[in-house]
Amino acid sequence: MRWSFLTVLLWLVSLTGAENGFNGWLRYAPVQCDKRCQRALPSSIVTLNSTDSGPIGTASQELQAGLENIVGKQLSIKRSSCGSRSSILVATLEQYRQACNRSSEVPSLGIDGFWLRAYGDTVQIVGENERGALYGAFEYLSLLAQGNFSHVDYTTSAHAPVRWVNQWDNMDGSIERGYAGPSIFFEDGHIVEDLSRVKQYARLLASIRINGVIVNNVNANATLLTSQNMDGLARIANVFRPYGIQIGISLNFASPDTLGGLGTYDPLDPSVISWWANITDSLYDRVPDMAGYLVKASSEGQPGPDTYNRTLAEGANVFAKALQPHGGILMFRTFVYDHHINESIWTNDRANAQVDFFKELDGQFEDNVILQIKYGPIDFQVREPVSPLFANLYKTNMAIELQVTQEYLGQQDHLVYLSPLWKELLDFDLRVDHQPSLVRDIVSGQRFDRQLGGWAAVVNVGTNTTWLGSHLAMSNLYAYGRLAWSPTDDSQGILQDWIRLTFGRDQNVLDTITDMSMASWPAYENYTGNLGIQTLTDILYTHYGPNPASQDNNGWGQWTRADHDTIGMDRTVKNGTGNAGQYPAEIAQVYEDLDSTPDDLLLWFHHVPYTHRLHSGKTVIQHFYDAHYDGAETAHRFLSQWESLKGRIDQQRYNEVLSRLVYQAGHSLVWRDAINNFYWNMSGISDEKNRVGHHPWRVEAESMTLDGYEPYTVSPFETASNYKAVVTTSNSTTGTAQTKLQFPSGTYDLGVNYYDMYGGKSEWTVYVNDRVVGQWEGNSENTLGHTPSIYIDGHSATRITFRGVEIENGDQLKIVGVPDGVEPAPLDYVVLLPPDVVD
């Protein structure tokens, strides 16, 4: 589709308007380029034998709009011979060879690859296909947007053919594990009418070389397959197609029964086979280039072939065969496990499930099936070993499943740059058959000579202008695309490209955000879960705040087996679940032995006393205490680092990021204290540094003089400072808590830890004597993206801080809380800190 001049103009205006995150890394902010600089750049864009509606047409429009915004130069678009001077030539490899007679100078190109040669005013962008040419155009614009006008001449091709993103969007417009607003695809059971945001999403994805999008939740609703909704899918596909992106959909295994009325969904039943073939034909009639299907079956209550005693391979192949006439791919998730297993049986282990279910099926899947394997054996934890399934399938296509949306990792309200986590997994050598077997080479198909393979990431963008709910979280989407294309790229290098494109080329900005981001995963691991114990979040509720007790005493299998004396899963072959033995011999030997197991996976593979000494010399329990304090201190440092950038970043994005970092600093303390108090209480072993349970700068709310407030026993107990909070005596009673301050006179940062529950917007006012020093409203459901909580717990716990408060010894501190809805203006404690002290 050809963009009108007005459309291009409006788009350019949008780029120069408010910096709200909508443009992501495609801001194309102006860089310094005087008239001499402009004369040295191309004057036109030449396309060879292409239509306006394809990716090359899109490339020409992107180049035209991008160069005008970046360097202020207007380029015409024309179709002519390859000999045009002062031009950007955009073509496929075949077009270039036919039109230019220069076959000898063209390098070889692999999957979706491109050749970019730029010498001043002469630029050649040649793609292995139209998609590759579009990627080359985005690459050239990325260089210019970062101020790089140097001569370049290189080729690059995709690491793997499949580079998809998954959206867990529901038909009602909600998004499972989405933290950035409603779906851009669905509402009220149908496809939305306005797909303008989908177009911008397509631009962002194409610029990082994503070639497929699964648009709906893996916990799929069969109503997506109605005629009306299939027509809607065609509209979505029409938006993505000019950007070289194919759409696919998730399927509900039981659809032949629930939607088709067959009374069965047995994958070997002829009527079921016919039903899926007909549905697939109908979809391809509407979307001829549909990428294929994604299926979650026999997992977490989702229907599957086990209902009829059929194998998972038989279940997958019914879809694969329906897709084969159309060239479609089936992505079949290996996230299959029993969530009712008995913890009292020492050898039970959810981590064994993927190999147990799929190893014996190797070679039984159709050639267009790719098994989509989560990076670890459990579920997107802050640290897991690589899934052993990658080492157990020789004759089956594989893809790695990552998660851009931060389900267990702070839900975009905590800064966590994920590329270093992913790189550690991708670079891991599984040593299959004692041969080099890097995970990245397994999923590409290279290691086992498979033709299909690749990448999937659960992204879950929403209608929030930042796409993911947080400006800084977009670094993870950018990094995913870069790694899916070239997994040998450096995490810091990827990050710095993103920073320059997103925030500009100010060196202070670059250095500061680099330092913050590269420290963020270790910090989050430190204050949420160490030594391979998993993310100690509430696995039964929000997957957000701390609740280590929720890991155990249930059938979900994310156990820690912590008791008074010991902690950790014994996954050895000798004494435990045998999970270590699922790895190839060289790796199994490392994990089987307590001494050779890396400290950061110790509690994943071994059950040890709290007093066990790590390679560092610390005991397990002291490492827990120290790491949680270190992590929280790092989160507080992020705040001061960001504040140093004031005036260097536009005000809107500066303030929005600042708000999240203020919250993260406070919530990291909730995490720190909850985990430390939990294990101190369980083990009875004190912190050698006497920090845990000792907070001399705090005043507990329940110790204050209360009027209209009453003490409340918090559950989990560890999510309140002294295991208690105060709440108003009724939802219509204003509460007052006051105390005489016994601190030396001076200037303090006054913090209040409270609970911001879903279902109410309480108001609080803090007084020193009769002077108001702070007021706020509990409205985090409007300002933050994490899954809210209706309880007083570690999800709703938070802190607000008022800086530079003058205090005299003996001053009267008073907090007045006005409840609202179900929220009884809950308070935990007040803290008065000298500047730069973290309590």
Swiss-Prot record:
Residues 1-18 form the signal peptide. It is found in: Secreted. It comes from the Eukaryota. Keywords: Carbohydrate metabolism, Glycoprotein, Glycosidase, Hydrolase, Polysaccharide degradation, Secreted, Signal, Xylan degradation. Its EC number is 3.2.1.139. InterPro entries: A-glucoronidase_C_sf, Glyco_hydro_67_aGlcAse, Glyco_hydro_67_aGlcAse_N, Glyco_hydro_67_C, Glyco_hydro_67_cat, Glycoside_hydrolase_SF, Hex-like_dom2. One of its GO terms (cellular component) is extracellular region. GO terms for molecular function: alpha-glucuronidase activity. Glycans are attached at N49, N101, N148, N221, N278, N309, N342, N464, N526, N575, N681, N731. It catalyses: an alpha-D-glucuronoside + H2O = D-glucuronate + an alcohol. GO terms for biological process: xylan catabolic process. Belongs to the glycosyl hydrolase 67 family. Alpha-glucuronidase involved in the hydrolysis of xylan, a major structural heterogeneous polysaccharide found in plant biomass representing the second most abundant polysaccharide in the biosphere, after cellulose. Releases 4-O-methylglucuronic acid from xylan. This is Probable alpha-glucuronidase A. It comes from Aspergillus flavus (strain ATCC 200026 / FGSC A1120 / IAM 13836 / NRRL 3357 / JCM 12722 / SRRC 167). The gene is aguA.
